Amino acid sequence: MAEIYVLVNKFILYIIGMIFMKASYLKLSVDEIARRVTQANQILTKCTLCPRACKVNRTKGELGFCESGLEVIISSAGPHLGEEPPISGSKGSGTIFFTNCNLRCVFCQNYQISQEGQGHPTTTGELANIMFSLQQQGCHNINLVSPTHFVPQILEALALAIPKGLILPLV
C-alpha cells in the first residue's frame, strides 16, 4: 500500500510540475532577448557577474577569480534523476554542470565538477545544441549547475536554441 502511495504522489507531483513549469523566457520577444544578451555581454568587459566582482575584461582574455574567459567550460551534461521528483520527473532534469564555480564553498558536494576547472570548452552554438538535445531526450527542464559566471553565454545560447524549438524551463 505504501508503494502505491509513493507512486501516486510522484505522479501527482509530475503532473503539477508539467502544468506550472512553463518557460518564462518564451514570453519575451526576440528583440527583448537580444537586448538582454547584449546587456549581459557588456558586463564581461568589466566582469561583475558574481559577488567577487573582479572587474576583469573577459572579452580581452583576462581571467578573474573564476578563471573563465569567453568560452563556456562544461564538465558534463545529461539527464539527471537525482533531483526532487517535481524537478526530475520521470525522465530526468537536463543538467548542465559548468566548471570554475566562483564561490569555492568549503563543503561543496560537486567539488570535482565545479571547482577543478576540468571540462570541455563549448561555444554558445554548441551549448544551444546541448540544451535542445536534452529536450529531445525527454528531460523536463534545463538544470544549470554553477552557471553564474557564464550567464551572458547561457543567454546567447538560449537565443540560439529558442528558434530550434526549445521550450523547457530553466532551473
Predicted regions and their residues:
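Flexible, acidic/Gly-rich N-terminal and inter-domain linker regions that tether
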Residues: 7-92
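Conserved Radical SAM active-site core
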Residues: 62, 66-171
